[in-house]
Amino acid sequence: MRVLIDACVLYPTVMRELVVGAAKLGLFEPRWSDRILEEWARATRKIDDAAEVFARGEIVMLNTAFPRAIISVKGGLEQRLWLPDADDVHVLAAAISGSCDGIMTMNNKDFPREILTDEGLIRFGPDEFCCRMLAEDPIGMRGVADAILAQAHAMGGESWEMRALMKKARLPRFGKALV
């Protein structure tokens, strides 16, 4: 299954690491466009310049790990498409250009199911998607989640519980399913 990952899923670290971890397990084929990756990098500027540099390094590593993930949008496609937020049309165009099965996004209102269905696409929320991946490979996804929890402990010095970390990362159902 090919899934286009929206920038809003790539930007939060825990969410990104979990979704990318599922892709590394071979549970799905990730897709993105240069524009989506650029949106992610620019969004990190709100933190500081170092965060943007870090994000750009992460982007290089992602493109190296998944060389077939990058999608080039077919010329003229965006002009025939419509979404409630015109700034998101490029995401839909990338999913169509990449022959994706779905789009993973947190922006449900900007990606109406009816419009996506007309284009042969499914909308996935990251929490729902990660729960599906957990059902497909419980051992693998548990391993990914455990590694993220260990990294959170190492980086933050805070003592996180899995469910609390996943809830903070806006993945509450996934966190509950792990317990």
Model-derived segments and spans:
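Acidic, PIN/NYN-like endoribonuclease modules and their adjacent C-terminal/linker elements
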Residues: 108-179
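Short beta-strand and adjacent tight-turn residues that come in two discontinuous sequence segments
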Residues: 105
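Residue-level detector of structured alpha->beta connecting loops
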Residues: 27, 99-100, 120
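Metal-dependent nucleic-acid phosphoesterase active-site entry motif
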Residues: 1-17
